[in-house]
């Protein structure tokens, strides 16, 4: 294997691929990245056995072939090379080394056998569809904050992506919950997604997928089976894009519809950004363990307060739109902030029942994104 490539293209491809590699590995080859040179393209492949990322970049290939090298070291070397450098990479099979040269810099990295590098098994996907990157970005960004980090409830450790019925017909829906808060986000159902099996996309995969979605003009091809989900950038078919394949969580997502309140009568309308900032301010004195903040609602008036015996107290009043009975209700400040930060519109609408029942929040009159948060005693 021998090729030369622009440093910027190499760094972009290696950065994306190596991000799935775990720093500590009991299987040595999983710490490596596979470089494969063929035609006028270099393919970079990395895996942790649950996620596989393949990135591609154009290069001048003098000799086809492949080798595996430490993902972390290779990435660090390329990152530290000067901007605009032309990087020459060459494998010496006899020595078991790969050399990296740019200008007056030269490095050698040890290799492990290419044939030992694991490949994710091929899959027959039940549904394949194309979706604009901004649509997928919205689905994941507005739901992933609610993913559970409790490993014993593994079936909550991801975003549940599925086809659902809404008042406007069938939609592509993303749901996440940790038992304390829930996010449900809808998007128009793409053509080809009708037979999509409901799958739970793991937290780490969501983080890696999100890196593919920053280009507003990009289209992403999504393929789903009962056990795997694949995301490919539009240019992947042309040999220069990224393909990410992940196993999905083998579990049953709970019946989330049961916890979404349907008829909470008390309505609060508040400036979302102002509300989030106020919660942040009063929570400064809350205890680290509970982070409790009390909402006291009266006619067109909201008082946020914290009373922490060990550290102090805080109170802030906001002008709001509220015309129902008085209500005092407590929440975890972090949960309120994270939900309020999802609001793209100016106003957030909270629907309450009483101090012990779940509260519903939505963005203005937009029904495509709703959030549920459980109260706590204060």
Model-found features: residue ranges?
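Structural preference for solvent-exposed beta-strand-turn elements
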Residues: 1-378
